[in-house]
């Protein structure tokens, strides 16, 4: 069963809390991040979002999707039937095709946005039937491309904590 989360208003948009923290809904489009007055001082975030894929993709892609995307390699990007022949670590197999002889998966993480958000000390807020869970964004990325996210959890939003002093950042 698939359920659309598109209509959940709290998962869209960018706002500033009374504490000064910036909240970015997981369904906020990357183009919205680059055009936001609230995020104007976050130069590295704006630059990273503006470099993701093409303008057409940035108009559809969300910040939540970008930070939670799968790691990829040439092997993993093949058809399901082809990958089943001799699975890699990520698919329960015993090898990494990206780097032969590696004892673990070394597929590359593709997000441009996640490293920038981690540099700001961002937190990820997940929701499920059990409630809400807030964790440092950096802590959700585990070995072999896995993420510390339960199957019933949905990324609700990201929080950039209020910074003391002048914020200076860059992304190239």
Question: Which stretches of residues belong to each language-model region?
Answer:
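C-terminal structural segment of proteins
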Residues: 1-172
